[in-house]
Regions:
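Conserved alpha/beta-hydrolase "acid-adjacent" motif
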Residues: 176-181
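Short beta-strand/loop motif that positions the catalytic acidic residue
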Residues: 163, 169-171
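Flexible "cap/lid" loop of the alpha/beta hydrolase fold
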Residues: 94-102, 107-136
């Protein structure tokens, strides 16, 4: 079995560990402004997912959810960060939920930023996947990279109620798609806080970094 290289990551600050996971076609740098606000009180680890940022990816067939979760575990092990609060935007939030389900001993809390749990309805799932395929073709992405953002099952939706750790939900005021997801989280998760950042859309952690950082500090500080 070929060993996958450890994902590139940034590691700043000291204190309780926050583990940041970005969204599709972003990279660790999207968290810079949030981490600038938090690194005085938290250890902030931010990864580049496979095929994103400084990570070259590993070729077609290597972007599935289980493999990427293994990549995140490898960073956790290398940094010896212990159990973490996972802070995920969009795709990163979905991966954070999956980690909390499959490896609950690694996760002490969830910061879900403009995130969703996937789809239980197969037709909705396929509509999402079609939109990802279209975007991948428009961007001329490396073969197979789109798989990282596609949904093949309803695992997270079906098992979300197993998650016991506290979650804080953060969404931009104009992010209507993921505002609906925030309602789903309140139904199934132990939501300790919900923050709507004014005048922000899906990239709320970039456009509204102070509000995102304040919500994370209030929930996990």
């Amino acid at each position: 079995m070929t060993t996958r290289p450890v994902l590139p990551y940034d590691d700043r600050g000291e204190g309780p560990a926050l583990f940041f996971v970005h969204g599709f076609l972003n990279d660790a740098s999207v968290w810079t402004a949030v981490i600038d606000e938090l690194e005085t009180d938290f250890r902030c680890i931010a990864v580049d997912l496979p095929g994103h940022g400084r990570s070259p990816g590993n070729g077609a067939g290597t972007y599935g959810r289980d493999l990427v979760l293994g990549d995140l575990r490898a960073v956790m092990d290398e940094t010896e960060c212990g159990p973490v609060v996972m802070v995920g935007h969009s795709l990163g939030g979905y991966l954070s939920l999956a980690m909390a389900i499959e490896d609950p001993h690694r996760v002490t809390g969830l910061g879900l930023v403009g995130a969703g749990p996937g789809f239980r309805n197969p037709d909705s799932r396929e509509q999402w996947n079609d939109s990802v395929r279209t975007l991948a073709a428009e961007r001329d992405l490396p073969e197979g990279m789109e798989v990282i953002s596609m949904h093949v099952d309803a695992m997270v939706m079906d098992r979300m109620s197993e998650i016991q750790v506290p979650a804080t939900v953060i969404v931009g005021e104009r992010d209507k798609r993921f505002m609906a997801s925030a309602d789903v989280f309140e139904k199934y998760l132990n939501v300790s806080g919900r923050t709507v950042v004014p005048d922000a859309g899906h990239m709320v952690h970039v456009k509204g970094a102070p509000g995102v950082a304040a919500a994370l500090r209030a929930s996990f500080g």
